[in-house]
Regions:
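Intrinsically disordered, low-complexity Pro/Gly/Ser/Thr-rich segments with frequent PxxP/GP/PP motifs
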Residues: 190, 194-227, 306-338, 432-463
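Hydrophobic, ordered structural segments
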Residues: 107-122, 126-134, 209-257, 325-369, ...
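A short beta-turn/strand-edge loop motif at beta-sheet boundaries
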Residues: 175-182, 291-297, 413-419
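Short, structured motif recognition centered on aromatic/hydrophobic residues
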Residues: 169, 187, 230-234, 284-288, ...
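Carbohydrate-binding surfaces of carbohydrate-active enzymes
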Residues: 170, 182-183
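Conserved functional hotspot residues at active sites or interaction interfaces
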Residues: 7-10, 24, 127-174, 239-292, ...
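Short, surface-exposed beta-strand/strand-loop-strand elements in extracellular ectodomains
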Residues: 183-189, 298-305, 419-428
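Hydrophobic, well-ordered beta-alpha structural blocks that scaffold small-molecule cofactor pockets
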Residues: 2-153
Length: 518
């Protein structure tokens, strides 16, 4: 039940890496507003033909059904003959029959494509395109190239204002640093059921300046009741960067809620990972924000223990642009920390938030991460270790031990990561390595927590400065394989209050003159 859309392509042989925009163009809230009238015209056709020269029709069909209405599908490229499209065999465009009363050219800015086939269109056949779904020109940064990524600098944020639960989004105008003049944000707030609560535009400050969107101020401005839903953000008239980056603060009225996470990934993924199972005194809630104008079918969002095939589906359909809180412990009641949960998202939503709610009343927010499906183990990493020093380093801070507990948990972040051959290094603030622990060839379903307190106590050690950092690195002494996509979750808890924070990072090769694989 995954959406058959392409959202992001990583670097690879013969492809242009980066985010894809067709799904964003079709799924933009303004496109969704215009779609019913456009789609009704298609449905009224006696015999609809679809001309699909660019291969867009099946993506359109994911959002606005075409297959049930199309009497014929035509293509431009002869190579596409014999490749089913919209459930039927396509024909060349020069075989367009005379009995079609409506021809859909599945493209934006299709004037050139229409002119190329004008002599083939029977008299009396109406021609329509995707242009009725297009955004107004004032929202485009590159009007001459509608699907240019810069035209769809968009993102979603979890946004709520309820008793004890407030949110604040903080971002910056980095677009003007690239030369953008008068950029602004186009914003739409959806409630939990996906209904629009407010739509507005907001000018951005001068180059490098910060912008804040506070749920209390939005609530007051639009005279809203309590809400918990999605804020859709579209940066317009921009240059240089097609992603809306932000920090998301959650805070309460009494100090029990205070946490921060960063932006959602703007491209919905098939899988996410790094969702921790709850401790006995915790509840872990996964926030799912439907990022498209079509429902998520019941059972399409699935959770499973990391490394296990058996999954459990969320048995409720989620309406377009709606938000749902999924209790991970209710779906997987036998799973507990340090076990991890994999999310089969089906490309239905952007990188999700999760909240940890503790028995002491404290709660914190963090995010899962995109789990790559294209990555495979790279034998060169093991072969080149003599040239790489520590190689890929996954660092996490160790906060002052007198005040905080620091815990690390390796997190598989690629579907092909069957194992992680790892060791942990503990380093004092002065740069001195205090301890090393070989963790072994860890299977993806059995990754241990690394509790700094327990490690120091077990080995009778201390951090002379009282704080420092921890590093996870590959260690191939017992064999194993690696892909360079090493991630970990860091968990920090204040001893005095019990308040905590989760964060996650990925590894890099730091400060090296040589490179490997890029």
């Amino acid at each position: 039940m995954a959406l058959q859309i392409e959202t992001f392509v990583n670097p690879g042989q013969g492809v242009t890496p980066g985010g894809r925009t067709l799904f964003k163009a079709l799924g933009h809230p303004l496109a969704a507003d215009a779609a019913p009238a456009w789609h009704a015209r298609l449905a009224r056709a006696q015999r609809l033909a679809v001309y699909d020269p660019l291969g867009y029709a099946e993506v359109v069909d994911q959002f606005y059904p075409l297959a049930a209405h199309a009497a014929a599908v035509h293509v431009q490229r002869l190579e596409d003959l014999g490749r089913p499209r919209l459930g039927q065999e396509p024909r060349p465009i020069d075989a367009l029959a005379a009995d079609h009363d409506l021809l859909l050219i599945a493209a934006f800015q299709a004037d050139r494509l229409a002119a190329q086939i004008a002599h083939l269109v029977p008299a009396g056949t109406e021609v329509v395109t995707l242009d009725p779904l297009a955004l107004p020109a004032e929202l485009l940064s590159a009007p001459r190239d509608y699907l240019a990524p810069i035209n769809f600098a968009t993102n979603f944020a979890l946004f709520r204002d309820e008793p004890g639960q407030r949110t604040r989004i903080v971002g910056a105008n980095y677009w003007s640093l690239y030369g953008a003049a008068a950029p602004r944000l186009w914003l739409r707030l959806f409630d939990a059921e996906g209904a629009p609560l407010a739509t507005w535009a907001q000018d951005l400050p001068p180059a490098g300046g910060s912008i804040t969107l506070d749920s209390r101020e939005v609530r007051k401005r639009f005279k809203l009741d309590d809400f918990c839903g999605s804020l859709f953000m579209h940066a317009v008239r921009v240059k240089g960067h097609e992603v809306v980056k932000y920090a998301l603060d959650t805070y309460g009225d009494d100090g029990t809620t205070l946490s921060c996470s960063h932006d959602a990934n703007a491209w919905p993924a098939q899988y996410y990972a790094g969702l921790p199972a709850p401790r006995p005194n915790e509840r872990v809630v996964l926030w799912v924000q439907n990022s498209h104008p079509v429902p998520i079918p019941a059972g399409a969002v699935r959770l499973n223990e990391m490394g296990r095939d058996e999954s459990v589906g969320f048995d409720e359909a989620i309406p377009p642009f709606a938000t749902r809180a999924i209790d991970a412990g209710a779906l997987l009641p036998d799973l507990a920390w340090p076990a991890q949960i994999e999310i089969d998202a089906g490309k239905h939503f952007v990188r999700p938030r999760y909240e940890v709610m503790r028995g002491n009343g404290r709660q914190r927010i963090a995010h899962a991460n995109v789990e790559r499906t294209d990555l495979r183990p790279d034998p060169r990493i093991r072969e080149m270790m003599p040239h790489l020093g520590k190689g890929y380093i996954m660092p996490l801070p160790v906060l002052p031990l007198a005040d905080f507990a620091s815990i690390a948990l390796p997190t598989p972040m690629a579907r092909a990561q069957a194992e992680l051959p790892l060791k942990a290094l503990l380093i004092d603030a002065d740069g001195q390595q205090v301890a090393e622990c070989f963790l072994g060839r860890l299977p993806r379903y059995a990754l241990p927590e690394i509790d700094v307190d327990a490690w120091l106590e077990r080995d009778g050690l201390s951090l002379p400065s009282g704080y420092g950092h921890l590093e996870l690195v590959y260690d191939f002494r017992d064999g194993g394989e690696a892909d360079g996509w090493l991630h970990a979750l860091g968990r920090y808890e204040q001893r005095r209050t019990g308040h905590g924070a989760d964060t996650s990072f990925g590894s890099h090769m730091f400060n090296m003159a040589v490179t490997l694989g890029g």
